Amino acid sequence: MVDIETARQMAMALPGTEEKDHFGMPSFRVNNRIFSTLWVKENRMMVKLSLIDQSVFSSFDKNIIYPVPNKYGGTGSTFFELSSISPEMLQDALTTAWQHIVAKKKER
């Protein structure tokens, strides 16, 4: 289990991360691109993964980690249920999403 504040701290611990509002939710960005949003009322976190990473993480347990049920889920946006996820799994997902954005910046 991961509480809201711990999830926030995990995201903010990644180098260069900024927290900004995104439609009333905390979002976490690097290079001005969102890699995660915190859904406080729902007690979940959205992590923006590649489709391959989304598939790998979701294979752990589709009740805990699953694509966002809208068009964004088809682009890698993935929900993590904070009440059921281990801190290590969430940290791994956040780091993976953060690395993907940082790597894109270096490609430019």
What are these regions (language model features)?
Residues 1-108:
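Charge-dense, helix-prone N-terminal extensions
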